[in-house]
Amino acid sequence: LTQTFYLFFFRNHSLVIERFQAYLKEYDKINISIITYYEIVSGLKHRDAQKQLTSFQEFVSYNTVLPLTTSSAIISADIYANLRNKGTPIDDIDILIAGIAIANDLIIVTNNIRDFGKIENLEIQDWSK
């Protein structure tokens, strides 16, 4: 799941919440990359949003934070090289999130289809539509 998913979720986007609840009925937990975790925590700290930070930390405690491993770093490096060679680079953070997802055989939930859609072998879902 990317940062945009959490923004939709914590802003009570009805369709995102509905799909989130359906997902949890089937899988029990959400997987969060350490990169997404960093993006959200750093953004909340920058805004001094302590209440939202506490809420997010509680949410995370019930779910799984996936680390950046050597395997996911190698996959990310392959993605980076492939996109650069095609002349279609995207942000390194998005590449790292994708590498973690591919290494763990997971789907990315995001509304950033423009960038994540450039990555081969990555399944994407947009729960906001």
Model regions: which residues?
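Histidine- and aromatic-rich ligand-binding microenvironments
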Residues: 1-2, 33, 90-91, 112
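Active-site neighborhoods of divalent-metal-dependent phosphate/nucleic-acid chemistry enzymes
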Residues: 64-109
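Alpha-helix capping/helix-boundary segments
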Residues: 5, 36, 72, 97, ...
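Hydrophobic/aromatic residues within well-ordered alpha-helical segments
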Residues: 36, 48, 52, 72-75
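General small-molecule cofactor/ligand-binding pocket signal
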Residues: 31, 66, 125
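Generic structural signal for small/hydrophobic residues in well-ordered secondary structure
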Residues: 2-3, 16, 40, 76, ...
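Short, well-structured N-terminal submotif of metal-dependent ribonuclease cores
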Residues: 1-32, 42-58, 63
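Acidic, PIN/NYN-like endoribonuclease modules and their adjacent C-terminal/linker elements
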Residues: 22, 98, 102-129
